[in-house]
């Protein structure tokens, strides 16, 4: 399968192939991040000390929401792996201070969600 596919248009946007598992992961990540957008805003707002949500950079918001999607909806990826991946992405696409900001909020949310049972990881070695 191609990276992006439309039922109406079978043209490839990228000339490389991904496995069905990678395609499922990508679709889940995209669809859940979009559909849970307002829920994620409500989860993030209380963790922003001395900041208004509308003042946070768009890329930082997106990266945090994608990480939350992995925490909640992708049971095969450990939370620490998700955090590290999004911190690495922030180094490339955001400001130098964003890394600490993203890490602090994700760490607080991860611990809170683990305690409340919202994060459930499955698979060998994934139960943290």
State what each model feature region is.
Residues 2-3:
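Short, small-residue-biased leader/transition segments that mark boundaries at the very start
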Residues 7-8, 72-78:
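Short helix-capping/linker segments at secondary-structure and domain boundaries
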Residues 8, 18-27, 45:
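Elongated, mostly alpha-helical coiled-coil "stalk/stator" tethers of large membrane protein machines
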Residues 9-13, 43-51:
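Long, contiguous alpha-helical segments
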Residues 15-20, 63:
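C-terminal subdomains that position terminal phosphate/3'-OH groups for nucleotidyl transfer/ligation
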Residues 23-31, 60-68, 106:
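Amphipathic alpha-helical elements of HEAT/ARM-like alpha-solenoid repeat scaffolds that form extended
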Residues 36-37:
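Fold-level signal for large, globular catalytic cores of enzyme and receptor domains
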Residues 53-65, 75-128:
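C-terminal non-catalytic interaction appendages of large macromolecular assemblies
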């Amino acid at each position: 399968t191609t990276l992006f596919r439309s039922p109406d248009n079978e043209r490839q946007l990228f000339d490389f192939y991904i496995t069905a598992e990678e395609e499922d992961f990508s679709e889940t990540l995209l669809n859940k991040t979009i559909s849970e957008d307002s829920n994620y805003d409500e989860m993030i707002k209380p963790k922003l000390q001395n900041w208004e949500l509308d003042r946070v950079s768009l890329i930082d918001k997106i990266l945090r929401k994608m990480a939350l999607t992995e925490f909640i909806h992708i049971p095969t990826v450990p939370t620490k792996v998700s955090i590290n991946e999004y911190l690495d992405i922030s180094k490339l696409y955001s400001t130098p201070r964003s890394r600490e900001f993203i890490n602090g909020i994700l760490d607080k949310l991860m611990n809170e969600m683990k305690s409340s049972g919202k994060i459930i990881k499955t698979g060998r070695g994934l139960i943290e």
